[in-house]
């Protein structure tokens, strides 16, 4: 695994006006910075900066001679502030919106000497962050690749964020129950029927759809922190590249790259 590095921003100003000290953690894969074009990878809701290598969550596409070729590119991935991968959590996560994460990453990249990104790619909230960075800094990114995401939190997402927040604060098993509910957000009734079709797990005497959901609840609880989940869930509800700006179409007029939106 690439070593986890830190970058400090002594006085970081949030969109709300609050000024805080901030330390970001990140990993670099492939070519060293300044030796090759740079690809920024933004992780998803419960992901982290470990995107490549034996335990990398995106190692199928990031690595030597893979889609994002680490023999050609410098790949950098930051941890969202508060995601807990670096054992650091946000004490006041509700002060943050996704645009703050965008600005923090941009400041860090500037201070690391990265003058341009060949690409910014991410899925879920990571893709929404790529949207935000492209609009906030339109001449900084040559290719924007948001995957399975939207440029604003829809009413469906906002409703689910509310329910997730209530589960995280009120449930006796908050991580497990929030993840079980989230799994339904990632699937449709048709996809569940196609995969399970009311089949039974005879060993557990449960429907396979039930054991699948319980498995994912337990799995997340074993590797993720509830404070990180609360922070990331809050940021999910703050997605909006048009916040304090004009319309979506106007925002795109000032964006130099052509976004390549990818749906799952």
Which residues make up each language-model segment?
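Conserved acidic catalytic loop of the alpha/beta-hydrolase fold
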Residues: 100-117
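Single conserved hydrophobic/aromatic residue that forms the stacking wall/gate
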Residues: 254-264
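Cap/lid segment of the alpha/beta-hydrolase catalytic domain
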Residues: 69-72, 77-103, 162-165
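Conserved hydrolase catalytic core segment
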Residues: 118-119, 124-146, 152
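N-terminal cap/lid subdomain of alpha/beta-hydrolase-fold enzymes
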Residues: 27-84
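Active-site nucleophile elbow and catalytic-triad environment of alpha/beta-hydrolase enzymes
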Residues: 231-250
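Alpha/beta-hydrolase-fold enzymes
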Residues: 140-219
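Catalytic-loop region of hydrolases
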Residues: 1-38
């Amino acid at each position: 695994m690439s070593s986890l590095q830190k970058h400090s921003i002594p006085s970081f100003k949030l969109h709300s006006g609050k000024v805080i000290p901030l330390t970001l953690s990140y990993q670099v894969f492939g070519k060293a910075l300044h030796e090759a074009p740079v690809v920024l990878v933004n992780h998803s809701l419960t992901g982290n900066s470990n995107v490549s290598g034996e335990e990398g969550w995106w190692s199928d596409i990031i690595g030597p001679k893979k889609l994002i070729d680490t023999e050609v590119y410098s790949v950098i991935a930051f941890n969202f502030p508060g995601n807990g991968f670096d054992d650091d959590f946000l004490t006041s996560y509700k002060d943050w919106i996704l645009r703050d994460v965008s600005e923090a990453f941009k400041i860090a990249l500037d201070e690391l000497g990265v003058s341009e990104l060949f690409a910014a790619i991410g899925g879920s909230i990571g893709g929404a962050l790529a949207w935000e960075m492209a609009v906030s800094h339109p001449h900084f990114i040559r290719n924007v690749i948001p995957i399975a995401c939207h440029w604003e939190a829809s009413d469906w997402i906002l409703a689910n964020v509310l329910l997730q927040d209530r589960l995280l604060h009120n449930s006796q098993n908050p991580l497990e129950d929030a993840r079980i509910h989230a799994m339904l957000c990632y699937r449709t009734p048709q996809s569940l029927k196609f995969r399970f079709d009311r089949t039974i797990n005879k060993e557990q005497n449960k429907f396979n759809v039930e054991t699948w959901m319980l498995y994912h609840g337990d799995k997340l609880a074993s590797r993720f922190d509830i404070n990180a989940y609360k922070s990331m869930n809050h940021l999910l509800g703050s997605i909006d590249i048009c916040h304090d700006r004009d319309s979506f179409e106007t925002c795109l007029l000032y964006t130099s790259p052509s976004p390549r939106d990818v749906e799952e």
